[in-house]
């Protein structure tokens, strides 16, 4: 249903992502933030399901600055590799990349953000610091407590 896209952050960095356009008139847009496993089949499926409900959904590849197009499965070995990406995250860079995703869909209508695991924490911080968001949902964002103040 969706397709790969290129997004440009405010510092000029180009990152990949996945975009699924709404079936029928768009109700708005959602930025979908990945778990530590990248924009893999699961995150693409989440975007496709939101699109089937009438939302444009875009998932920025927030690890592209470290390893372009990183995607992982869920085996113990793959989890160990994926965890290396979050050992010392660059929050400023991730937020620039998320803002690029927000900007890419802001013409659609109201924009919300939803994230899972690391993405849940990113969604929380994005809602507090970035422009253009009307709603945010963070699922099991373990790093949220670091930003509670």
Question: What are the language-model segments listed below?
Answer:
Residues 1-149:
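N-terminal cap/leader regions of alpha/beta-hydrolase-fold enzymes
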